[in-house]
């Protein structure tokens, strides 16, 4: 009985991953959501909108270790909860 209980606890810990990984949207299409589990250490979800004249809005979304910054690109929106963007 103790062995069964211990096995269940271990399986639960492995399956739940103790909440150490973030889930972010990985789709580059604004109206589509594609949740993706981030790698360890990547705890920020980000989204960068690129205006494209005559076309739909282009987005880049994903996981990051910190909020991306680049003066040549539009400002990134960042957050630190699952599926927040």
Curated annotation (Swiss-Prot):
Short name of one Pfam family: Toxin_cobra-type
Disulfide bonds: 24-45, 38-63, 67-78, 79-84
Signal peptide segment: 1-21
Sample GO molecular function, one term: toxin activity
PROSITE patterns for this protein: SNAKE_TOXIN
Domain of life: Eukaryota
Expression sites (tissue/organ): Expressed by the venom gland.
Entry's localization field: Secreted
UniProt-listed SUPFAM superfamilies: Snake toxin-like
Protein family per UniProt: Belongs to the three-finger toxin family. Short-chain subfamily.
Protein's name according to its UniProt entry: Three-finger toxin MALT0044C
